[in-house]
Every structure is written in structure tokens, then in C-alpha cells.
Amino acid sequence: MSGNLPNTDDVLLQVPDVRCLRSAAETDHPPRILLLYGSNRECSYSRLLTLEAERLLRYFGAETRVFHPTGLPLPDDAPVTHPKVVELQELVEWSEGQVWCSPERHGAMTGVFKSQVDWIPLNSGAIRPTQGKTLALMQVCGGSQSFNAVNQMRILGRWLRMLTIPNQSSVPKAFLEFDDGGRMKPSAYYDRVVDVMEELMKFTLLTRGNSDYLVDRYSERKESAEELSRRVNLQNL
């Protein structure tokens, strides 16, 4: 046992070690960022805000993909082999970080957005496709500024075991913040979007090569060791 920690296993209880962390320079490809938005409207301000975020991320050096939710079936209303479901899940696995953007409707994120998250599995075989990946949150409001949608999405990010960055963006009266060409106008709200994407890139560069180590847990190492022991014992019967 570890000193005065009689309930722990010496072999499995590891002291965190900075030498186990990889340098950002050791990863030889641009950060891979997936962007999701929560509206199928032809004039979708969450989509326009997402595209502004994508432009910033590309400027910062990221490789980006935007998933367009039109045609995605409701959860459990189609098999996981549906082409849009396959597309979404493959993009989730490809990504090292994500941006989520939803309108706030009736005080909550939209069903369009939640349906996308509900198609993301917590486990895919032995892989947790979102665990340890970074996440940035944004929302658009039709009226005064609110944070209900981003707060709800923050909870979802925690359930998916993602590293949600501290900063976030909420754009009130979004219909006033974009020009006729669909570009966001200069404002403090735009500056906040810049801040959020800059922060997402920094967190992704810091963590993407280290996510497996950062989320390696004592309880899961212990469980894995016990499962291995059981398998060996069964083979010896």
C-alpha cells in the first residue's frame, strides 16, 4: 500500500509526471476542428456564426470540417448506418477539438442541435470518440443576450468527457450582427468570437497529443487489471 493510503494499489497508483506530456511540436499535422450548428433554416444565424468561427480557425492554422445537419434523422429513428449518421460519427472521431453553436429557442438549445449530440456515442468499441477533446461553445439569440444554450451545452460536453474551454460566446439580436453578405459586422461580440477561437486553438495545441494521458484514470486502470485477472483465471480453469 502507498504509505497512509491503504485502500490503493501501489502498482496502479501513479504520480502525475510532466515527462509523460508530449510537446506540441511532436504532432505533425494541423489541429483538426469539427464545427456543429443547430438550425436547418435557409437564413441560419448559427450557421453564419459557425462559418465566421471556421474562418478564424483556419487563419489560426486549423484544419476544419463543418457538419451540416440537414437530412440527419432523429435519434433512434434510423439505423446507425444512415449516411448522415455515419458522416457525423466519422467527423467526431477525426476531430481533435470541436465548436458547438446553437440558437436559443424556448430557453434552450434547439432540437436540431441536441439530435446531433445524441447521435454521438459515448463508446465505440474500445474507443471513446470524444473523451479528452477540446470544445468551444457559442449561441445566437433572437432577442436579448442569454446563456441558457451554452450552459446546457457545457453540461453535454462534460457528459461526453470533453475539455470545454472557459470562454464562450453569446450573440444577442443576431439578425443585427450580420451584413447582407452573411458576414459578421465588427463589434464587441465579434471580438469575443475571436477570443473564443484563439483560446480553443491554444487549448487544443496543449492537449491534443496528451489526451490519452490526461484522461488515464486510476479507477479504470484498476478495473482493467481486475478484468485481465478474471480472464486469466477463467483460462486456467
UniProtKB/Swiss-Prot annotation:
Optimum temperature is 35 degrees Celsius for the ferric reductase activity. It holds the Pfam family FMN_red. Its cofactor is FMN. Optimum pH is 6.5 for the ferric reductase activity. GO terms for biological process: protein homotetramerization. Its EC number is 1.-.-.-. GO terms for molecular function: ferric-chelate reductase (NADPH) activity; ferric-chelate reductase activity; FMN binding; FMN reductase (NADPH) activity; oxidoreductase activity, acting on NAD(P)H, quinone or similar compound as acceptor. InterPro entries: Arsenate-R_ArsH, Flavoprotein-like_sf, FMN_Rdtase-like_dom. FMN binds at S39, N40, R41, E42, C43, S44, Y45, S46, S102, P103, E104, R105, H106, G107. Gene3D superfamilies: 3.40.50.360. It comes from the Bacteria. Keywords: Flavoprotein, FMN, NADP, Nucleotide-binding, Oxidoreductase. Disulfide bonds: none annotated. Belongs to the ArsH family. Has NADPH-dependent FMN reductase activity and high NADPH-dependent ferric reductase activity with highest activity for Fe(3+) as substrate. No activity with NADH, iron trichloride, Cu(2+) or Ag(+). May be involved in cytosolic ferric iron assimilation as an NADPH-dependent ferric reductase in vivo. Homotetramer. This is NADPH-dependent FMN reductase ArsH.
